[in-house]
Amino acid sequence: MQNITQSWFVQGMIKATTDAWLKGWDERNGGNLTLRLDDADIAPYKDNFHAQPRYIPLSQPMPLLANTPFIVTGSGKFFRNVQLDPAANLGVVKVDSDGAGYHILWGLTNEAVPTSELPAHFLSHCERIKATNGKDRVIMHCHATNLIALTYVLENDTAVFTRQLWEGSTECLVVFPDGVGILPWMVPGTDEIGQATAQEMQKHSLVLWPFHGVFGSGSTLDETFGLIDTAEKSAQVLVKVYSMGGMKQTISREELIALGKRFGVTPLASALAL
């Protein structure tokens, strides 16, 4: 019998959650991570599944995700502990045939349930499936320190925030030319913040929750982690720059345009226009 804890997707979740913990992005039970799978990914591990999978209804049906398996982090679980006990802190779930709920096939032992932000994740998965023709498979939420810090001092506007991050590090425009969506402050763990996040995910692979954290989307765990890491590195540079009295010189609009042309990306027009 193959052990599911040795599968690429469990091992990938262990690495991503451990790396995020070591970065300082996921204190206590902060942060959550979901990865969309295919039936072929989980088929070799059916002998590991619960004999009687628990069923949990969704707060709203999501027919686009019908019959789709995911691996998810658990509610109240600490990222630092995933590596110690994957079955207690992660779960493989599968949405039912009408998208009204899901079964917990593996993991989330001792009656644990998926992250409280699952509505935000699933709604964002729906939008990124449509926006990327199914390429994006990962939604990651974390409390990236410097990005959060900037939401207290920068105007919480997509164009303004995006332009500052592009100027903070040359690679940013190449990595997220679509910019950073920003919400108003909202209560987490609700359908409302999930819907607002998903709406921004139609246009952006990064969405900031002011005074709270960031959501990122990508095709793989590495791509998604790298996306957030790149934005966070720029935010760290900006925090240092602002603390030293602000910018005396920076990347110009003309240079940003040249950068986009060189790497074949189309920068967010509203950010470029500032």
From Swiss-Prot:
Domain of life: Bacteria
Active site: 117
InterPro entries for the chain: Aldolase_class_II_sugar_metab (IPR050197), Aldolase_II/adducin_N (IPR001303), Aldolase_II/adducin_N_sf (IPR036409), Rhamnulose-1-P_Aldolase (IPR013447)
Database matches in CDD domains: Aldolase_II
Cofactor note as given: Binds 1 zinc ion per subunit.
GO biological process: pentose catabolic process; rhamnose catabolic process
GO cellular component: cytosol
A GO term for molecular function: metal ion binding
EC number: 4.1.2.19
Record localization: Cytoplasm
Entry keyword set: Cytoplasm, Lyase, Metal-binding, Rhamnose metabolism, Zinc
EC top class named in words: lyase
Pathway: Carbohydrate degradation; L-rhamnose degradation; glycerone phosphate from L-rhamnose: step 3/3
Reaction equations catalysed: L-rhamnulose 1-phosphate = (S)-lactaldehyde + dihydroxyacetone phosphate
Pfam family, one: Aldolase_II
Cofactor: Zn(2+)
Entry binding sites for Zn(2+): 141, 143, 212
Protein purpose: Catalyzes the reversible cleavage of L-rhamnulose-1-phosphate to dihydroxyacetone phosphate (DHAP) and L-lactaldehyde.
Protein name per UniProt: Rhamnulose-1-phosphate aldolase
Organism expressing this protein natively: Escherichia coli O139:H28 (strain E24377A / ETEC)
